[in-house]
Amino acid sequence: MIDQYKHQQLRIGLVSPKQISAWATKILPNREIVGEVTKPYTFHYKTNKPEKDGLFCERIFGPIKSGICACGNYRVIRNEKEDPKFCEQCGVEFVDSRIRRYQMGYIKLACPVTHVWYLKRLPSYIANFLDKPLKELEGLVYCDYPNFSFARPIAKKPTFLRLRGLFEYEIQSWKYSIPLFFTTQGFDAFRNREISTGAGAIREQLADLDLRTIIDYSFAEWKELGEEDPTGNEWEDRKVGRRKDFLVRRMELAKHFIRTNIEPEWMVLCLLPVLPPELRPIIQIDGGKLMSSDINELYRRVIYRNNTLTDLLTTSRSTPGELVMCQEKLVQEAVDTLLDNGIRGQPMRDGHNKVYKSFSDVIEGKEGRFRETLLGKRVDYSGRSVIVVGPSLSLHRCGLPREIAIELFQTFIIRGLIRQHLASNIGVAKSKIREKEPIIWKILQEVMQGHPILLNRAPTLHRLGIQAFQPILVEGRAICLHPLVCKGFNADFDGDQMAVHVPLSLEAQTEARLLMFSHMNLLSPAIGDPISVPTQDMLIGLYILTSGTRRGICANRYNPWNRKNDQNERIDDKNYKYMEEPFFCNSYDAIGAYCQKRINLDSPLWLRWRLDQRIIASREAPVEVHYESLGTYHEIYAHYLIIRNIKKEIIFVYIRTTVGHIYLYREIEEAIQGFSRACSYGKTVLK
């Protein structure tokens, strides 16, 4: 519906029989009223056309093809505002076939039927209003032995049961003696005067309720129970507490019905709405076989049983009352199965032992109508996959699997193939994409270079839950992500999934580049703290990367249990020499040796370092001093080494480190230099 502010909205609730009739009934130009479905048939087996007054009737729901009636006549639909014309022979209007998506029908039930959601769902709204046990109400509705029960009619005329209520004593067997009269002659007159059974009794009692009186009486009782002192009996006190909770729920329910202008008797159905045909289709599959929605079969079951009950009530006056009650029970069960199959019981199955999919199954759950097609629609140009860590990625890049990328950018690839005259039409281009020719990957790379993508992880609780990235192709089926951006998404690499979206318009791409790229969202929008900080895996990696030489040369020299060579073998104290650890002139040589697998990531090494006044001015005493024949000597400290000439001048300085330390230092140095260049560039622009 559309409210006064032109906001589209959907409201779910109870409606009156008059409203159901207004939705489903329509008046043809010849003043004929149609809308009631009376036949349980769908299509004629010979003509393959919808049966008249059946579940797919074109008179009720509209034509299957726009402007074509059931006779095959055709009329041009010029203006929908004009009065629609119809075929006088078959009674089908010449309107658009899309009317079959929203035009409803109805089934006029031969007996009232309780809505199973309001009777059997817990808490039961009907039991709450009537303040009666649910088992007693079920016995009244379904007439099941031995839980069979009946109610007094609401009529004010004197009855035997009303007179019986004046006596002080009770006959315990009266409840079981009444069913003996079901097969006696004249039972109908007795039943109509003395007792009321089935959903009709529920409807009478609900219609006789005054909601404001219920609120007043419930509040008075709740207040009275609240003023009573505890009895000391745990069972009695708990019973009083449950009664008070029940009264609160009853008052809230009555207030809700008053606020929404809903009458309690609407929970008992007299007219059963029939869904539009397009929402419960019959589809022809390969081999000429028909595949139908389960709801059609459930509707057919309701119509069959309802027509049988109608015949029993109208044509056969001598029908036993017990047979009528059994048929009413069958109608009630058929409607229950249609609305919610298997609620608090065994579900109904077809001939292949498959459970029928009822109306509740269609709308509820993750794959239901609301969550799949209304609330969480599937979006074009989008995909979903598991995320894994991409340690070699830049902060603003993400790895997109080839299988996902070729589907998301398929239209762009087709355009590229046609522009480069590699395909004559769309069909040829799609065949090349299916065959995954080498030129496809080249064009895909060109397309992805200038096209950002959006990654989203549900739930999106703040604006950093969706960020833009520059995609690159990767092997496998998982999306590769830089670990620093995980905190903004509140994601980790334990099986989390992310959705991929392709911004199509120029405005969306501009917004993604200028506002949503991950390297532009380094601070939390809420408190301003850095949000791209190392966590979890990165902290462990940094620890392993820098854990090689924490204890210095002293530990390696005087504690042989802590010294191991590259083959993970313990070095004997007598054979250990610092000269056995490799020397490198610069960091590039050390990294090259690591890439050639001559040293490990945590293997200690000596790296030539620039002269540092902090090292020279240090008062630390050397661990050892080694003299050479030319007069030079080596001063060995815990973490560094100084080579001096005969004049005690410093020639070289070496620091004891690992390849992991070198990697970390280079990254930090490059980051500082980049930040410095950015600051200097900003100052230049401001000048």
Swiss-Prot record:
Catalytic activity: RNA(n) + a ribonucleoside 5'-triphosphate = RNA(n+1) + diphosphate
Chief location: plastid
Any one GO BP annotation for this protein: DNA-templated transcription
Described purpose of this protein according to its UniProt entry: DNA-dependent RNA polymerase catalyzes the transcription of DNA into RNA using the four ribonucleoside triphosphates as substrates.
Primary gene name: rpoC1
Cofactor(s) needed for function: Mg(2+); Zn(2+)
Disulfide bonds: none
EC number: 2.7.7.6
Subunit record text: In plastids the minimal PEP RNA polymerase catalytic core is composed of four subunits: alpha, beta, beta', and beta''. When a (nuclear-encoded) sigma factor is associated with the core the holoenzyme is formed, which can initiate transcription.
Cofactor note: Binds 1 Mg(2+) ion per subunit. Binds 1 Zn(2+) ion per subunit.
Protein name per Swiss-Prot or TrEMBL: DNA-directed RNA polymerase subunit beta'
Subcellular location: Plastid, Chloroplast
Binding site for Zn(2+): 69, 71, 87, 90
Top EC class, one word: transferase
Cellular component aspect of the GO annotation: chloroplast; DNA-directed RNA polymerase complex; mitochondrion
